[in-house]
A protein has these predicted regions:
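Non-ligating segments of multi-cofactor redox enzymes
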Residues: 1-251, 256-280
Length: 280
C-alpha cells in the first residue's frame, strides 16, 4: 500500500501515535536501544545538534552531527517525507507531540488554555533563533533541560527508573515539566509546544511551506470553490493553522503551522478539505 493510500484510509491517527510512543519511549525504548541509548537524548536527540557550538560554527556543527548522528538522520528522513507528503511525522508518529496530545485529551475542556491569539510562526522562529544561538548566549543548556524530548521520556520512564523521577523533582526538572504541561497537556489541542517551541517543528514547517508551492507534492489543502466559510475547521485545528478573516468568505490555511493531521477534514461539512496535489 502506498503511503498516500495509507494516509487516506486511516480514520484515527492514534494507533500510529501509540506505535511511535512504544518505539521511542520507556519502558520499551526500542529504537533508542538499537543505538545504545536509554532515552531520546544523546545520539538519538533530533534537536540538540541544531544548537551552535562555541567551538566555531563549522567545526561545532560537524561535531554535533557526529555526536548525534541518529537524530540528524531522523530529522533528514522527516524532512524528506514532509517535502513530498506533508508533516506525517508530527501528526502521526512523533512520540512527544503525540503524548502531549493524547494526555491533553484526558483533561477537561474547561481547564484548557487557548494559545490561538499567538502569532505562532513569529513566536516559533523567534524562539528557534534563540535556540540555535543558545550556546553563545548561555541558554543552550536551559533549552535542553526544558526540552519536551527530555521531559516526556523522563516522565514515561520515571516509574521504572528512579533517576528519572529524581530529576523531575529538581527545580530544573519541575520547570521543564511545567513548560510541557502548560504548552502541551493543558493547551487546547495539546500541541502548543509543537507549534511554538519545537525546533524540529520549525524546520519541518519550513519544508512543508516551501514544498507546498510545487504542484507534484501532496499536502492537506482547502478547495476554495467548496469552502462555505462556516469556520468549523478553525475550531478543530490543534495548531490554529486555519483562520477565517472577516474580509474573505473562505478559510485560509497557514502551511508553516499545519501538521497534516486531517482533523479539519473530519469536521468540514462541505468536503472542502482534501489531501493531495494542488488543484489547477
Amino acid at each position: 500500500m502506498r503511503i498516500t493510500e495509507l494516509f487516506g484510509r486511516v480514520k484515527h491517527r492514534y494507533l500510529f501515535i501509540l506505535a511511535g510512543m512504544l518505539l521511542f519511549l520507556p519502558p520499551l525504548n526500542l529504537i533508542p536501544q538499537t543505538v545504545g541509548e536509554t532515552n531520546m537524548c544523546g545520539k538519538v536527540c533530533p534537536r540538540l545538534f541544531l544548537i551552535l557550538s562555541t567551538k566555531g560554527i563549522a567545526s561545532g556543527a560537524l561535531s554535533n552531527v557526529q555526536a548525534m548522528w541518529f537524530g540528524v538522520g531522523l530529522v533528514a528522513t522527516v524532512l524528506i517525507i514532509t517535502f513530498f507528503f506533508g508533516r506525517l511525522w508530527c501528526s502521526h508518529l512523533c512520540p512527544i507531540g503525540g503524548a502531549t496530545e493524547l494526555i491533553g485529551r484526558l483533561i477537561p475542556a474547561r481547564l484548557k488554555i487557548s494559545f490561538a491569539k499567538i502569532d505562532a510562526p513569529a513566536f516559533r522562529y523567534g524562539y528557534f533563533a534563540v535556540f540555535v544561538a543558545g550556546a553563545y548566549w548561555g541558554a543552550g543548556n536551559i533549552a535542553c533541560k526544558l526540552c519536551s524530548y527530555r521531559v516526556i521520556p523522563f516522565l514515561a520512564g520515571s516509574p521504572f527508573e528512579p533517576a528519572y523521577a529524581a530529576y523531575l523533582s529538581t527545580s530544573m526538572g519541575m520547570a521543564g515539566l511545567l513548560t510541557v504541561a502548560l504548552s502541551g497537556f493543558f493547551a487546547k489541542g495539546g500541541r502548543a509546544y509543537c507549534n511554538c517551541l519545537c525546533p524540529v517543528g520549525a524546520v519541518d514547517g519550513l519544508a512543508n511551506y516551501l514544498s507546498s508551492k510545487f504542484g507534484f507534492t501532496k499536502k492537506v489543502r482547502t478547495d476554495p470553490g467548496k469552502c462555505v466559510g462556516c469556520g468549523q475547521c478553525v475550531t478543530t485545528c490543534m495548531v490554529w493553522a486555519l483562520k477565517k478573516p472577516e474580509a474573505t468568505e473562505t478559510v485560509q490555511r497557514d502551511t508553516l503551522s499545519c501538521v497534516s493531521c486531517m482533523e479539519c477534514a473530519k469536521s468540514c461539512p462541505a468536503g472542502a478539505i482534501y489531501y493531495g496535489k494542488r488543484q489547477k
